[in-house]
Design a protein with these regions (language model features):
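Zn2+-dependent metallopeptidase catalytic core
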Residues: 7-29
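Hydrophobic (often cysteine-bearing) scaffold residues that line and stabilize catalytic clefts
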Residues: 10, 14, 68, 72, ...
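Catalytic zinc-binding patch centered on the HExxH motif and its immediate surroundings
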Residues: 23-24, 28, 33-55, 64-65
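Short pre-active-site segment immediately N-terminal to the catalytic Zn-binding motif
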Residues: 54-71, 85-86
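Catalytic Zn2+-binding segment of zinc metalloproteases
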Residues: 75-93
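Post-HExxH zinc-binding segment in Zn-dependent metallohydrolases
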Residues: 87-109
Length: 109
């Protein structure tokens, strides 16, 4: 289940991005709640609410490409929690994959 706590235009884009990622990584049973916020002290953050359930906050005050990459970055953290596989705090992997995933999303891969 994916829930975007927003009624503005990014809602459809966010739903599509999260659905694409979860399907691609076989995480369709995972629940993700996304909170797009105009002002944050960072670009995005993710937290585990409970097993299989996550909350992502993402700043909308950035370019479209950076916004998509930020959502992907936080979804990599969701994947890390779900699989139990990461090194350190998982940031290096998320940073390495965020723009690659964003570009693959835009290219429809």
């Amino acid at each position: 289940m994916i829930k975007v706590l927003e009624t503005e235009p990014p809602k459809k884009l966010i739903l599509n991005i999260v659905e694409w990622f979860l399907l691609r990584h076989d995480l369709t049973e995972t629940k993700v709640y996304v909170h797009p916020l105009h002002n944050m002290n960072c670009w995005g953050e993710a937290e585990q609410i409970c097993e299989g359930e996550y909350r992502i906050k993402v700043c909308t005050n950035q370019s479209l490409r950076d916004f998509v990459a930020t959502v992907m970055h936080e979804l990599v953290h969701v994947q890390q929690w779900e699989t139990g596989v990461w090194k350190g705090d998982g940031e290096k992997e998320a940073e390495k994959r965020q723009y690659k995933l964003a570009d693959e999303y835009w290219k429809g891969k």
